[in-house]
Amino acid sequence: MSLRRALAALAAVLSMALPVGGQAQSMSPEQRQPLNAAERWLVTVDAERYANAWAMAAESFKASVPQKEFRDGIRRIRQDYGRVVLRKSEKIGFVGEAPKPDDPTGAAKEGMQIAILFDTKFAGSKRATEEMSVVLGKDGLWRVAGYYIR
């Protein structure tokens, strides 16, 4: 799938996502895991530790974006926006099929994907929407599989 198609699919999912707002505080630790993974990754990018951010990403991300290309691209984008002043998660939703309420395990399954939108204010009063997807890996950890800023 091309990057453009993937971003279009992510945008479509996010348009149907649920607002996070005050929900983040009432989420269980398991429900917060994808959001926590996205936030940790963003903090790493904010600190300009681009090699670490690339290493933290999902295998699908690393396979589609070579480390040097990621580093150069994210550095250029972040220089245009400046430092982060405030970031707030706005929406979160499943990509594809959500877990079934009657599933006795209630557990997230490998390959499950979550889309997250952040409303971010940068230095110089620039605002942007950061769109992310995180995927549950074989190791049981949530990792960033996609990132787009607009």
Predicted segment positions?
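Short charge-dense sequence patches
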Residues: 22-28, 80-85, 130
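Exposed beta-sheet edge and beta->alpha loop/turn motif
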Residues: 92-150
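Short solvent-exposed beta->alpha transition segments
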Residues: 35-36, 40, 51-111
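Internal amphipathic alpha-helical segments of the cytochrome P450 catalytic fold
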Residues: 50-51, 141
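Short, low-complexity N-terminal intrinsically disordered segments enriched in polar/charged residues
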Residues: 3, 12, 19-49, 55
